[in-house]
From Swiss-Prot:
The keyword S-adenosyl-L-methionine applies. GO terms for molecular function: carboxyl- or carbamoyltransferase activity; S-adenosyl-L-methionine binding. Belongs to the class I-like SAM-binding methyltransferase superfamily. Cx-SAM synthase family. This is Carboxy-S-adenosyl-L-methionine synthase. One of its GO terms (biological process) is tRNA wobble uridine modification. The keyword S-adenosyl-L-methionine applies. It catalyses: prephenate + S-adenosyl-L-methionine = carboxy-S-adenosyl-L-methionine + 3-phenylpyruvate + H2O. S-adenosyl-L-methionine binds at Y35, G68, C69, S70, D92, N93, R199. Homodimer. It is an enzyme of class 2 (transferase). Gene3D superfamilies: Vaccinia Virus protein VP39 (3.40.50.150). SUPFAM superfamilies: S-adenosyl-L-methionine-dependent methyltransferases.
Amino acid sequence: MKDTLFNESLNKRFCFDEKVAHVFDDMLERSIPYYHEMLNLGAYFIAQNLKENVYHKSLPKPLIYDLGCSTGNFFIALNQQIQQDIELVGIDNSMPMLKKAQEKLKDFNNVRFECMDFLEVKFKEASAFSLLFVLQFVRPMQREVLLKKIYNSLALNGVLLVGEKIMSEDRILDKQMIELYYLYKQNQGYSHNEIAFKREALENVLVPYSLKENIALLESVGFKHVEALFKWVNFTLLVARKT
């Protein structure tokens, strides 16, 4: 279904409710440059990591968490890349999103979804975690706490994927990056009003960090190896490995 939510001002903060869930896939594809390419790239690195050295002895089979899984797109990409038996757990606090995810992945028997606040979940030991365009919605004070929980729950050599909208620490460059991104959205069919109304709704809801800040945050919780797998202007995909 086409995203037309912001044809007029919602006069409220952005939230992942039923209206958003109905159009969310279209919103993602038209709002995040190279969205599917980043999903496939992230799935490839998790698949390679599992194949090479992360089948941890204490795990009956590899467990992968997708936090803020929304409509389940990343699990589709993972199932296309990974041939071995795996367990996929998607956690999201939006039931409308999870209903969409369950519909899309009903034919996969290795997936389960839980409607919970992932900040309160006690994770099992896992081979991989993903936070794809999610950390930017977590309150800044809670980000380090969440990442430390993830780090402590990762098996040795396990990986964390982090996809984020980012900002530049240089005011002029940041303005230019935002302008280019808005041009991208216009080319995807969004009007000036839609872009402005969505920006208004996301104010103080989506709080981006710079690339440097995100990497420093990952390193602060224990990750010694963090790489940018992909970057387009103000979007990036990071991989962090526990060693």
